[in-house]
Structure formats: structure tokens, C-alpha cells
């Protein structure tokens, strides 16, 4: 009897172990014939591996795809080709994707410290319509970035600027004598750039966006170019310039319609767009994520063409912690929704709304059951009551993909004042996230540090903002230009350190912390945009180390507290900002300020 019991127990244990094992499948990319540090094109191999995984794995299984540590090269040839409409990017299609993950569940991509290097014009990684997925332990870079890094070697007021391209920059002087960057399948002409101090990698003081005209350029020696029309006394020899264009076709990582995603120890060293763009996703965690250089000895000065991370129309909770964001050409993080402009009132329950910005359209805006509210664009005041969508369909084409206009029917009657003539926007309140931004370092970047536009709880704590060049923290809201929603109702900014922000001027940069909704007609505004309660925005226990005056600018706020903060003044730069006030407030009520 004892033998039978032992056998039964052994059988039960073996079945349990095999059941657990069956719940997790582990694949190694080397199984598919791709080895680390080989010159083999990884794009078609990874595409086939993902297809095999999808075919073999059962619903509910945990799946791990591992890459043995090393370098993997992804080319356009053999990549996945998709039509993607990506918020705040160029809507040019099709897109070529190196690692396309779609309709996945419980998938982990583990790079084990690998470098994923891309060529041409590609989206390195996409993750769409997926649940419970993890991306971890890899970096993203391009062999030939579309930004051309050059160093000023001579600056003659009469003869112009002479510069040397960085060793990795391939270039040519065109037939019409223009400096052009070259890469696999692309040619770039550069209209403007950002200047970095050659020693500190800070954005050069009081330069902002600089023009870099190279018409008439010629080589004076191998890899040494004189540009007679490029004259700028601020660019002393040794200055490094990141030459760039206006385009932003491809983020490093594109996420859409995902639920519960984690990005752990992932680094983006370059992308011709944002480092990470997530739209219409729920619950995202970034831990140890970086848009950064490859350490202190990296010869590059720049990272991404636009924001480091960007979250458009997401919900749930966005957590971004322990990250490093440096050298990017825009904000470290931007969280917002998108206003649709009312272009037609069909009846008392139906409106036609339109995506207005040329880089934000073509993707889903809302669903039946979503809560919405309406705003008057001129004064950014809410009008009427909150409402609910009962039906929504694309209006200018037959499907959501690529649509710019939507017919939306609401549960309750729409306020009679809302029409297509006076300027009104529709805001989706359901697709708004809670945000925790903590323990991050933001440094040496263009424009601003962080930007938040969400009514849900937002906590910004224990971060280092080091020479962000513009405003360190911006609370915005705009139904006139960018059309990025919305009002902030519950914001805590605490235990952060700010070192010499505002060395340059960019949009909305009125102080180190700038609460700046875009309100064309502020004088006729009766209500307030941000806040709405006592302590709606609290700024406390921070340290400001600054060379200039403006610490806090606020416009149209009800409920603002500034307390227990330390302000130190240094002489590292000459004060130049037009705002000479420590605290400049416009239409702010219910405010308490004490250093």
C-alpha cells in the first residue's frame, strides 16, 4: 500500500511539474539560425521566429524569446512592412519594422544585454494589441543616425564656419554645393541644429535652435568643410552641433492598444522620432528605461530626434522610474490626450470632430461608453456638462485606420452653444492616465524636461533635472495648436533637484516650472483651467539651483501651493530671461507661496 501511495504521489508531482513547464515556453533566437555578433540580417529571422511562436503557443502560456548577449543587425530588407498611424509623428506609410509584435499575450523579449542595431529608416520595435508583455535587457541604436554630428574647428566672421563631421558620419557635397548626410537608403539635408558645449555636453547657453545653412559648402581638406554662409559668433571652435531636419517618421519603440506592459532596462541610443511612443495603452511601467548615450565616453552628444518618451491617449497608470534621459531633441516625457475640433453640429446629440495637428491623426480616438467633456478653444473653459459616447464611427473614410474625422453621438443633449463656428474641442476623459515619474535623471536636452496634461493623479518626485535647457516641468493644455489635452487637477512635485534650467528659450518656457495652458483670450476667461481645488497643484521640498530669476510661472490656476523649497543662486551663466520675477502669476487664485 505504501508503495502504491508513493507511486501515486510521484506521478502527481511529475504531472504538476510538467503542467508548470507547459505554462512557460522558452525560445532562443539561435534556434532559428541567428547568432550574436554575426553580420547576418536579423530582420527576416526574427520575423519568422515571431510567426512560429504565435503558431505554436497556446492561449495563457508564458513565452520567453531570448537573445544571447551580443550585437544583432536589422536591415530594411526582410523586415515587417506595416501601415501605422503614430501619434505625434509623420504620417507617412508604409513603415518598416525590425521586431513587430502584434496580438501577443504573456510574451517576454529578453535581450540579455544585447545591442539591436538598425539600418535605414525603420521602427526598431512595435508592440500592438498585446497583453502582459515585457521588453527587457536590450538597447536600440542605428549604425548611421539621421542626425549629423559635426564639430566647429574654425569660425571666421568673414569666411564662415569650418567644421568636421564625426567619424561615423557619411556625407557628400551635392552638385548644388550643399552638405548632405548619407545612410542606407536615405539622404538628408540639414536645415537647423542644436549646439552642445564640447566639454560639458550641455546645450550651449542662449542658442536654442540654430540655423546651419550649408549652401556653397566645400571641402578644404579631407573631412573638413567650409560653409561660407554659416555665420554664428556663438559657435566657438570646439562646439559640437547636431544637424537635423524637421521630420520624425519612426519612434524607437511604438506601442498601441496594449494592456499591462513593462519595459525593464531598455536603452534607446537613437531613433528618428521619439524613443518610446505609446498610444491608447493601459498600464505601462518603465523601470531603468533610458534614452541615453552609451556612457560618459560616448563620442555622440545627441540621442533621439524628438521626445524620449511620449504617452498619447493612454489610461490606467504610467510609471516611469530610475531612468536616464539625455541629449534628446525634446521632452523626457509628455503625457496627454488629443482634442478633436468640432467641425460640424449634426443635431442635438451628434457632432463631427476632427484631428487637427498634421502629426496626430489616423488612430482611434474613443469608444462607446467613454466619458467626454467640451472646451471653448478661445478661453479654454469647459462648456456644458460631461457626456458619454453612445456611437462613434470614422467620417472621412471607411475605417478607423487613417481616419481624421469622426461622427460621434452622445447620450445626453449637447449644449446649444457648441457649434462649428466658434471653436470648440472634445476631450476624452476615459483615456487619461495616472502618472508616477520618480527617480529619473534628465539632462543636456533640447526644449523641456517633462510635460504633463492629465486630470488624474500625477506625482513627480526624487528626480534630477540637470541643464534641461528650457523649462524643467511644464503643465500645459492646448486646443489651438498642438491640440493636446488637458487640465491638471491633482499634481504633486516634490523632492526634485533643478540645476540651471532655462539656459535657452523654447515654447512655453516661462520659468523653471511653467504652468502654461495655451489660452488665446485670457482676459475674457471666467473659470480657471488647471487645479479646481485647494492644493490641486503642490510644489514642495524641492531644491532649485539657478543662475536666473524665474522659478514658477502659472496661468489660469485655482489651487496652487509652493512651500518648503530651497532656492540657491549661482553665477555660472549671465541672467537673460525676459521674466525677471521669481513667481509670475496670471489669473491664479487660491494660491499659497512660501519658500
UniProtKB/Swiss-Prot annotation:
Its EC number is 3.2.1.n1, 3.2.1.n2, 3.2.1.22. SUPFAM superfamilies: Pectin lyase-like (SSF51126). Residues 1-22 form the signal peptide. Keywords: Glycosidase, Hydrolase, Repeat, Signal. One of its GO terms (molecular function) is alpha-galactosidase activity. Transmembrane segments: none annotated. PbH1 repeats lie at residues 432-454, 455-477, 488-541. It holds the Pfam family Beta-barrel_GLAA-B_II. It catalyses: Hydrolysis of terminal, non-reducing branched (1->3)-alpha-D-galactosidic residues, producing free D-galactose; Hydrolysis of terminal, non-reducing linear (1->3)-alpha-D-galactosidic residues, producing free D-galactose; Hydrolysis of terminal, non-reducing alpha-D-galactose residues in alpha-D-galactosides, including galactose oligosaccharides, galactomannans and galactolipids. Disulfide bonds: none annotated. Belongs to the glycosyl hydrolase 110 family. B subfamily. Alpha-galactosidase. Removes both branched alpha-1,3-linked galactose residues of blood group B antigens and linear alpha-1,3-linked galactose structures. This is Alpha-1,3-galactosidase B. It comes from Bacteroides fragilis (strain YCH46).
Amino acid at each position: 500500500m505504501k508503495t502504491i501511495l508513493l507511486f501515486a504521489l510521484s506521478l502527481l508531482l511529475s504531472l504538476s511539474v510538467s503542467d508548470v513547464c507547459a505554462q512557460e515556453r522558452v525560445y532562443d533566437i539561435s534556434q532559428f539560425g541567428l547568432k550574436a555578433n554575426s553580420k547576418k540580417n536579423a530582420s527576416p529571422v526574427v520575423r519568422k521566429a515571431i510567426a512560429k511562436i504565435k503558431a505554436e503557443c497556446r492561449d495563457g502560456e508564458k513565452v520567453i524569446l531570448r537573445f544571447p548577449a551580443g550585437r544583432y543587425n536589422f536591415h530594411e530588407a526582410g523586415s515587417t512592412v506595416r501601415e501605422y498611424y503614430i501619434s505625434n509623428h509623420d504620417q507617412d506609410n508604409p513603415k518598416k519594422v525590425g521586431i513587430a509584435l502584434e496580438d501577443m499575450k504573456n510574451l517576454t523579449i529578453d535581450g540579455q544585454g544585447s545591442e539591436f542595431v538598425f539600418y535605414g529608416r525603420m521602427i526598431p520595435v512595435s508592440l500592438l494589441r498585446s497583453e502582459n508583455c515585457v521588453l527587457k535587457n536590450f538597447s536600440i541604436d542605428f549604425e548611421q543616425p539621421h542626425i549629423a554630428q559635426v564639430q566647429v574647428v574654425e569660425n571666421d566672421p568673414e569666411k564662415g564656419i569650418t567644421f568636421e563631421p564625426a567619424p561615423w558620419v557619411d556625407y557628400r557635397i551635392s552638385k548644388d554645393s550643399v552638405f548632405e548626410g548619407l545612410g542606407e537608403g536615405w539622404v538628408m539635408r540639414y536645415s537647423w541644429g542644436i549646439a552642445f558645449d564640447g566639454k560639458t555636453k550641455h546645450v550651449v547657453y542662449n542658442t536654442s535652435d540654430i540655423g546651419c545653412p550649408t549652401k556653397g559648402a566645400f571641402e578644404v581638406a579631407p573631412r573638413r568643410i567650409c560653409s561660407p554662409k554659416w555665420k554664428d559668433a556663438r559657435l566657438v571652435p570646439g562646439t559640437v552641433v547636431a544637424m537635423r531636419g524637421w521630420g520624425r517618421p519612426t519612434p524607437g519603440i511604438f506601442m498601441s492598444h496594449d494592456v499591462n506592459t513593462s519595459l525593464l532596462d531598455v536603452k534607446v541610443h537613437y531613433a528618428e522620432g521619439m524613443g518610446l511612443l505609446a498610444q491608447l495603452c493601459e498600464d505601462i511601467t518603465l523601470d531603468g528605461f533610458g534614452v541615453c548615450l552609451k556612457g560618459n565616453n560616448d563620442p555622440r552628444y545627441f540621442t533621439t530626434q524628438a521626445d524620449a518618451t511620449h504617452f498619447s491617449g493612454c489610461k490606467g497608470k504610467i510609471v516611469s522610474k530610475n531612468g536616464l534621459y539625455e541629449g534628446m531633441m525634446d521632452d523626457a516625457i509628455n503625457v496627454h490626450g488629443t482634442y478633436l475640433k468640432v467641425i460640424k453640429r449634426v443635431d442635438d446629440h451628434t457632432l463631427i470632430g476632427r484631428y487637427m495637428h498634421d502629426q496626430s491623426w489616423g488612430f482611434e480616438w474613443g469608444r462607446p461608453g467613454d466619458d467626454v467633456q467640451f472646451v471653448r478653444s478661445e478661453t479654454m473653459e469647459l462648456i456644458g456638462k460631461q457626456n458619454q459616447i453612445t456611437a462613434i464611427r470614422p467620417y472621412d473614410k471607411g475605417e478607423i485606420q487613417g481616419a481624421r474625422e469622426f461622427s460621434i453621438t452622445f447620450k445626453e443633449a449637447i449644449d446649444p452653444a457648441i457649434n462649428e463656428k466658434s471653436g470648440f474641442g472634445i476631450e476624452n476623459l476615459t483615456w487619461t492616465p495616472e502618472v508616477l515619474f520618480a527617480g529619473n535623471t534628465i539632462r543636456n536636452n533640447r526644449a523641456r524636461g517633462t510635460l504633463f496634461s492629465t486630470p488624474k493623479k500625477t506625482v513627480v518626485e526624487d528626480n534630477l533635472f540637470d541643464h534641461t535647457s528650457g523649462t524643467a516641468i511644464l503643465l500645459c493644455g492646448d486646443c489651438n495648436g498642438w491640440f493636446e489635452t488637458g487640465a491638471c487637477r491633482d499634481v504633486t512635485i516634490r523632492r526634485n533637484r533643478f540645476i540651471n534650467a532655462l539656459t535657452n528659450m523654447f515654447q512655453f518656457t516661462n520659468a523653471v516650472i511653467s504652468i502654461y495652458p495655451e489660452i488665446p483670450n485670457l482676459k475674457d476667461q471666467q473659470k480657471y483651467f488647471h487645479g479646481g481645488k485647494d492644493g490641486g497643484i503642490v510644489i514642495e521640498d524641492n531644491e532649485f539651483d539657478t543662475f536666473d530669476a524665474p522659478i514658477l510661472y502659472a496661468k489660469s490656476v485655482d489651487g496652487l501651493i509652493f512651500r518648503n523649497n530651497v532656492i540657491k543662486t549661482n553665477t555660472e551663466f549671465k541672467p537673460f530671461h525676459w521674466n525677471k520675477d521669481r513667481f509670475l502669476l496670471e489669473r491664479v487664485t487660491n494660491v499659497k507661496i512660501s519658500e
